[in-house]
């Protein structure tokens, strides 16, 4: 049994911090519809956004909690998932002392945020089939290791990590295991959200930028124990999610049928593109995927990338990433966009 204790990993200055209290925080338990607000030095003339937004985004959290069978107190929202990830560093990692573990090839912001926050990033490569090397990860852990980052389904490889590997890390690591589920909606695997109450050191990040089609509003989600969320709430900026973002998110989150249709279309087009890539003569390998993209190994990634750019098709060249030499990542577009990509791929020499 993992004897995880939030107090042992929280930074001392954060533990003693008295968080900033915004004007609106003081009235969250009141019916504010008829109240006159003269407390925050706002412009009083109504235009839809003249007032500060709800600092706790309660109406958005209520929908997320209902949709995912969790509690509002287990949710933190951020200005994109990157803000959520940054808050984790700032709450739990002491600069120039602590370290985190990431598993390349993976999402690059874990390493970037480690550098920004003066935290050592210990990289443990995935296996050749892109699975965690659990024993090597645990061997790399020391008393100053605060977070292990797992991206599952993984970017840029597209595959999910085995349940056995994740459980072993959750059970044997006394810091936070952060599972980045940005692409979970495209996978047949169940989200780790169902295990939050089982593992107090489990943190899950999700986003509205992928399956929900709201990359432009920047809304990231963190699910964790109430203890972890309470620490993050102490250090988050008071109005980190603006009113327009909150309104648009609520509209979209209530339209689950349309979202499911779009996800189904993306998965259908993913399978179409996958079949074509397997037949293209310069494609050497197509990796299994549970995301809205496909990673393919080609004969010359730089050459093929530039050829597609000349045709007006922008993909991602991942050849500089560990274990991804000569690999290209194809995001799945609409049926019409996919048709153009397929046509041009067949014409390339």
From Swiss-Prot:
This protein's UniProt keywords: Amino-acid biosynthesis, Aminotransferase, Histidine biosynthesis, Pyridoxal phosphate, Transferase
Record GO terms (molecular function): histidinol-phosphate transaminase activity; pyridoxal phosphate binding
Subunit organization: Homodimer.
NCBIfam families, per database record: hisC
Family of this protein: Belongs to the class-II pyridoxal-phosphate-dependent aminotransferase family. Histidinol-phosphate aminotransferase subfamily.
Entry keyword annotation includes Calcium: no
Annotated HAMAP family: HisC_aminotrans_2 (MF_01023)
Natural source organism: Flavobacterium johnsoniae (strain ATCC 17061 / DSM 2064 / JCM 8514 / BCRC 14874 / CCUG 350202 / NBRC 14942 / NCIMB 11054 / UW101)
Catalysis: reaction(s): L-histidinol phosphate + 2-oxoglutarate = 3-(imidazol-4-yl)-2-oxopropyl phosphate + L-glutamate
Protein name: Histidinol-phosphate aminotransferase
Required co-factors: pyridoxal 5'-phosphate
Residues annotated with N6-(pyridoxal phosphate)lysine modification: 210
UniProt pathway: Amino-acid biosynthesis; L-histidine biosynthesis; L-histidine from 5-phospho-alpha-D-ribose 1-diphosphate: step 7/9
InterPro entries registered for this protein in UniProt: Aminotrans_II_pyridoxalP_BS, Aminotransferase_I/II_large, HisP_aminotrans, PyrdxlP-dep_Trfase, PyrdxlP-dep_Trfase_major, PyrdxlP-dep_Trfase_small
SUPFAM superfamilies tied to this protein: PLP-dependent transferases (SSF53383)
Protein EC: 2.6.1.9
GO-annotated biological processes: L-histidine biosynthetic process
Keyword flag Transferase: yes
